Design a protein with these regions (language model features):
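N-terminal onset of structured domains
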Residues: 1-56, 64-68, 86-89, 113-117, ...
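Solvent-exposed serine/threonine-rich low-complexity stretches and specific carbohydrate-binding patches
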Residues: 62-76
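Short amphipathic alpha-helical surface micro-motifs
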Residues: 31-32, 65-67, 79-80, 101-105
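Aromatic sugar-binding surface patches on proteins
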Residues: 76-84
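Surface-exposed coil/turn segments at beta-strand junctions on protein surfaces, enriched
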Residues: 78, 91-93
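Short, surface-exposed secondary-structure junctions/capping segments
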Residues: 78, 131-140
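Internal, hydrophobic beta-strand segments that form the core of beta-sheet-rich folds
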Residues: 93-112, 117
Length: 161
């Protein structure tokens, strides 16, 4: 991985628990910010999600949904903004982590710039429905302006989950 040019963090985290085969109620949202001035040849930033084992040391299978997204802001695709992944589904029971990698495309190809792992997601049949907390609701309303296809109607639906 190249030197750090960006920070990547979860703005809306994956749930702590989910049911196998059912999509997460809310999308996972990542925040991307440059550290200093990114390399001039970066043309586009993309995040992609994969599933890891509980320790985060090995790949796991069973993640499906919209696994890639462009980094966007109010002005379109940018070097600083947000990316929305989802709906995401984990097909089998177990304990996993979501790994999200930030990649930069340039005329020279694509390179991974950063990655972040979620906390453990316990996938089991008895998992409660994921409902946004009041803090998440407030944050989701702020994100409606960020060109991520999140609407007040979506937020209301997630609150009723």
């Amino acid at each position: 991985m190249a030197g750090r040019e960006f920070t990547l963090s979860f703005d809306i985290t994956p749930p702590a628990a989910a049911r196998p085969g059912l999509p997460f109620t809310m999308p996972v949202v990542l925040a991307v910010k440059p550290i200093g001035t990114p390399a001039q040849n970066v043309q586009h930033l993309v995040v992609s999600a994969s599933l890891r084992d509980e320790a985060g040391t090995g790949a796991a299978v069973g993640l499906s949904g919209s696994l890639t997204a462009s980094v966007r802001s109010r002005t379109g695709n940018t070097m600083s903004g947000y990316a929305k992944l989802g709906p995401l589904t984990i097909s089998q029971p177990g304990k996993f982590r979501l790994r999200v990698m930030l990649s930069a495309a340039s005329v020279n190809g694509v390179i991974t710039k950063e990655y972040v792992d979620s906390t453990v997601i316990h996938v089991h049949a008895g998992a409660a429905a994921q409902r946004p907390t009041p803090t998440q609701v407030a944050r989701l309303h702020q994100l409606t302006a960020e060109n991520l296809d999140i609407s007040p109607a979506d937020i209301a639906t997630w609150q009723r989950a």
